[in-house]
C-alpha cells in the first residue's frame, strides 16, 4: 500500500487541539495521512476562521511543517506537531466538531489544499456516479499506479466516512486505510 506504515487516527492524541472531547474527523484524517505521505508542503500559507458550535475556530497556516516529527504509526503519547497539523487541516475544511463524530464535506478538500497548502491547481475530486463501473476502476488504478492515493468517501442515509484507497491487487481487490489507527 502507498501509505505504508502511516496509520493515523481521529482520537488521542491526534485531536489534542480540537474542541475538548471531539475527534479530528475522518475527512481531515484521510487528507492528513495523504499529505504526510508526500511530506508536502514544507510551509502553509494564509489563515482561516469560521464560526462553529464551539465559537470561532481559527488556524494560521504560515508555519514550517515538521514532517519528520510526525511518526507514521499510531501515537502512544502526545505529539504537538501531528495534533497541530491535523487540527489545521480540520479547520481548513470547516470541520463540524462533535463528540459523537466530526464531519465536513469531502468536496472541500481540493480547495483547502490549494488555498492553504500550495497544492497545484489540478488537484480535484471526482464523483463515482459520473463514471461507469469500469471507468471508475480504471481511474482509481491510474491514480494508484501514478503513486497517488485516492481519498474515498462512502455512506448512506445514516452518515458517511472518508478513507484512503492506497493499493490494489491483480484480482481488483483494493486496499483501504480507514483512518482508525491501522484498520
Question: What do the predicted segments below correspond to?
Answer:
Residues 111, 116-177:
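Active-site-adjacent substructure of cysteine-protease-like catalytic cores
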Residues 101, 105, 132:
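Catalytic cores of large soluble enzymes that bind and process phosphate-bearing ligands
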Residues 1-102, 169:
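Active-site-adjacent structural segments surrounding the nucleophilic cysteine of cysteine proteases
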Residues 10-11, 33, 77, 106-107, ...:
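Residue-identity detector for glutamine
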Residues 179-183:
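Conserved catalytic-core surface of thiol
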Residues 22, 27-34, 105, 109-113, ...:
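Stable alpha-helical elements in mature extracytoplasmic
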Amino acid at each position: 500500500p502507498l501509505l505504508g506504515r502511516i496509520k493515523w487516527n481521529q482520537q488521542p492524541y491526534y485531536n489534542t487541539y480540537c474542541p475538548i472531547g471531539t475527534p479530528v474527523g475522518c475527512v481531515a484524517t484521510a487528507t492528513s495521512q495523504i499529505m504526510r505521505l508526500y511530506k508536502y508542503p514544507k510551509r502553509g500559507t494564509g489563515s482561516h476562521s469560521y464560526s462553529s458550535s464551539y465559537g470561532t475556530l481559527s488556524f494560521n497556516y504560515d508555519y514550517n511543517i515538521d514532517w519528520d516529527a510526525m511518526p507514521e504509526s499510531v501515537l502512544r503519547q502526545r505529539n504537538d506537531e501531528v495534533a497541530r497539523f491535523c487540527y489545521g487541516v480540520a479547520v481548513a475544511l470547516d470541520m463540524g466538531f462533535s463528540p459523537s463524530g466530526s464531519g465536513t464535506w469531502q468536496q472541500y478538500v481540493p480547495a483547502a489544499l490549494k488555498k492553504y497548502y500550495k497544492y497545484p491547481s489540478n488537484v480535484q475530486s471526482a464523483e463515482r456516479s459520473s463514471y461507469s463501473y469500469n471507468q471508475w476502476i480504471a481511474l482509481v488504478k491510474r491514480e494508484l499506479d501514478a503513486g497517488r492515493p485516492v481519498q474515498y468517501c462512502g455512506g448512506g442515509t445514516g452518515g458517511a466516512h472518508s478513507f484512503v484507497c492506497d493499493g490494489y491487487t491483480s484480482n481488483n481487490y483494493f486496499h483501504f486505510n480507514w483512518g482508525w489507527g491501522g484498520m
